[in-house]
Amino acid sequence: MTFKSGYLTVRETEIWNLRKLIPNQSEIARKLGISRQAVNFALISIEDKMERTFNETLDSNNLTPVTMNLVDGVMEAYSPAYQLPVIVSLSNINGLKVWYLYEGNCLRCNLERSCRRTLLDEADERGVDVADDERKMEPTKLALKVYSDDLKEKTILGS
């Protein structure tokens, strides 16, 4: 089951998208024509599902959590096996993605173009401006640019 098809219902996805733009539950409720309590209940369910998704990702990839931003769907983690920082993202356009932040051989990798396109789509969905010269950045650096704002609004785990 992937994030795209199985974790959030259509209504929950709609509420999650609005929450990124409108922090006030009452305003979200008015916009959707439902009660504030219904929005609150949905947000509790959304956060639970997203946290479970992140925890499953941590477990399946043997990662250690660092920070988690459930509003924007971004988690910072660490890979003890590869000794690398990792960004895990959830989005409508790309679903669940795991980005290992290493200085690799992106220019020689056959996935470089696909990674860059995915990151540029993420930037569009998240409203991140990417200048023309930045569009050609190595995917690792582009990932840091795309997710840097989301990682500032975070919950530090273990404190």
Where are these regions (language model features)?
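Short, Lys/Arg-enriched anionic-surface-contact patches
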Residues: 1-10
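Short alpha-helical "recognition helix" segments of helix-turn-helix
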Residues: 26-35, 39
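Helix-turn-helix DNA-binding helix
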Residues: 39-40, 46
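Helix-turn-helix/homeodomain-like alpha-helical modules used for DNA recognition
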Residues: 63-140
